[in-house]
Amino acid sequence: MAAVDLEKLRASGAGKAIGVLTSGGDAQGMNAAVRAVTRMGIYVGAKVFLIHEGYEGLVEGGENIKQANWLSVSNIIQLGGTVIGSARCKAFTTREGRRAAAYNLVQHGITNLCVIGGDGSLTGANIFRSEWGSLLEELVAEGKISETMARTYSHLNIAGLVGSIDNDFCGTDMTIGTDSALHRIMEVIDAITTTAQSHQRTFVLEVMGRRCGYLALVSALASGADWLFIPEAPPEDGWENFMCERLGETRSRGSRLNIIIIAEGAIDRDGKPISSSYVKDLVVQRLGFDTRVTVLGHVQRGGTPSAFDRVLSSKMAMEAVMALLEATHDTPACVVTLSGNQSVRLPLMECVQMTKEVQKAMDDKRFDEAIQLRGGSFENNWNIYKLLAHQKPPKEKSNFSLAILNVGAPAAGMNAAVRSAVRTGISHGHTVYVVHDGFEGLAKGQVQEVGWHDVAGWLGRGGSMLGTKRTLPKGQLESIVENIRIYGIHALLVVGGFEAYEGVLQLVEARGRYEELCIVMCVIPATISNNVPGTDFSLGSDTAVNAAMESCDRIKQSASGTKRRVFIVETMGGYCGYLATVTGIAVGADAAYVFEDPFNIHDLKVNVEHMTEKMKTDIQRGLVLRNEKCHDYYTTEFLYNLYSSEGKGVFDCRTNVLGHLQQGGAPTPFDRNYGTKLGVKAMLWLSEKLRDVYRKGRVFANAPDSACVIGLKKKAVAFSPVTELKKDTDFEHRMPREQWWLSLRLMLKMLAQYRISMAAYVSGELEHVTRRTLSMDKGF
């Protein structure tokens, strides 16, 4: 559907009623989804009902079904679990139970149902929808409802959102709750690492995932675990010997700890369970290592949702409401999923069918097929884990030397990218150098060769272990060229922010003057500002958004306690408003001022009046975000003075400048993983390019496509030549001319109850799940 006009949209919701429920196991981010469905529903003029206690509340009716207003879902976005309750319901699996549920929905005039839950809950919803007509006939026959009512409510629309920490649903890159569960697992691994190192221990960590190894796989990849057990890929026979050999080997190389990660559903080739206690006993008996088991259990479901889960849930929930409004008698029940950074609608039963096929493949011991059916990203994660976990000597030494450096400001995930690039390069037989202190270090000859074990333990470290500088190559080209010649460097991998991109562009433009610069170059965008052209996500921006979000959560709590207080919070990001916008959505801010969305004094007046109106309700707190360079004259101090003066007698005002807090401590699971993947993919690309341009015993690369930025664009990882990106770059303000996340600002304003035109909102199309669509790697 094309963009929708606000008036038409508001009319399309009028007279409709939407019921929202959470079912099955809880997942962090469900509250953000409930909030967004409720507010979007009310926004378009529909009535919204919160159905408490999942399907149980639907069957029992009464007080469990309550009409919601705008304030019903205030201040819940930061809470874990689900505030409307969830239950596993036996009654709904029977025809009588579903008949009672249909009766309760008709009583409230609800014919649109948004179900947030796992595949079981969504399958139940689809059965309910297919039986709807016959259930109403039975209710008419019993005299419980009139024929007129049955005609009025003759059709039930279903839109599903997948809430499950296991990420076990086919057709979506991420389910609601998965990212937060990974946060909990990584927090535990980081904490365990310090005690394990102190005592030279081995830890066996058991994570959730009875039928799906996603959490185990990604946390193993993000922590550099020594061994991994997942149900989709049982270990080869004789694995006990291999595992003990590998653990012994890492210890003999000086490592003080071993980490083994096991999914609770891990099995061997014969389908027999492998338990964490069995693995522990094995290590103790064979190696005599001090070994402990930690079962994470329900810790993984707990805690506050991560920024990714809050934004993902809000985006999907808006799309679900649109899907319900646009549904006709012929549209199938759909589920809203994530593909890259796009929300997509898929037929519910196609996804459920594919999900069941994975299980069937595992039951039939077709394990390779099971991994393929899990999707391209899962398969890619698995292959990268196998590549990086253990050093295998290269088949042959190559003649190539590569150098890796960090440029710009420190960003979380830089070290993960360097580690994986170093190890991939070594496994391909290349000589790998690291350069300290960016281009300046390259000019001064601060270059050293690096080995496999030199980068051990780098994954979870924040900042930049190599040291990073903002200096560009321009003033020191002679010295840089000299050192490239001395060390015989054939390729450069530059991990960094806008300066990394600009620096490589300068080197490429100097190729005509210096033949030594006719080498292969690649930029991995790493900056908290997310302002590098050629990618939708820069490394480090997820950690920065989470750091800003945690600070804002605390600030909001302070405002709640004080009553009638507004906080103005300044975020970093240069001219790029990504941090302010995404943090704003994640914390439910009232406004976020950014450079890309120009505003004038009239807009500020509207905002202040909006805040004054808000203070008359039960929500007596406000939070306004401001990007540091959003306006030359409307500074943070100006906004503080304006809000203080206009709000006099109604609310008072305080400011907070978050500053370098936003560079974050330890990288988030997303950044560790994304960095690891970009490092591997960039190194594989460099290796391939080097082979292509190797002529007569030397490397000569001068084609535009020999110097690229690697990044995630929409649904896939892409390489864009720096010379082609030049025309798409605003060098004055250091950012791309077009930015995908500006479409998220509609959601920010709508959820803060601003009247806006939805003309720019583009709904997701209904697509289909096939083995081909599953095979794409989206980088998650």
Swiss-Prot record:
EC number: 2.7.1.11
Function of the protein: Catalyzes the phosphorylation of D-fructose 6-phosphate to fructose 1,6-bisphosphate by ATP, the first committing step of glycolysis. Negatively regulates the phagocyte oxidative burst in response to bacterial infection by controlling cellular NADPH biosynthesis and NADPH oxidase-derived reactive oxygen species. Upon macrophage activation, drives the metabolic switch toward glycolysis, thus preventing glucose turnover that produces NADPH via pentose phosphate pathway.
Source taxon at top rank: Eukaryota
Gene Ontology biological process terms in this record: canonical glycolysis; fructose 1,6-bisphosphate metabolic process; fructose 6-phosphate metabolic process; glycolytic process; response to glucose
Keywords from the named record: Acetylation, Allosteric enzyme, ATP-binding, Cytoplasm, Glycolysis, Glycoprotein, Kinase, Magnesium, Metal-binding, Nucleotide-binding, Phosphoprotein, Transferase
Pfam family for this entry, one: PFK
Localization (cell): Cytoplasm
Protein name, as recorded: ATP-dependent 6-phosphofructokinase, liver type
Modified residues (Phosphotyrosine): Y640
Gene3D superfamilies according to UniProt: 3.40.50.450, Phosphofructokinase domain
Catalytic class of the enzyme: transferase
Species this chain originates from: Pongo abelii
Region described as N-terminal catalytic PFK domain 1: 2-390
Modification type Phosphoserine: residues: S377, S775
Regulation: Allosterically activated by ADP, AMP, or fructose 2,6-bisphosphate, and allosterically inhibited by ATP or citrate. GlcNAcylation by OGT overcomes allosteric regulation.
Glycosylation site residues: S529
PROSITE patterns: PHOSPHOFRUCTOKINASE
Source lineage: Eukaryota, Metazoa, Chordata, Craniata, Vertebrata
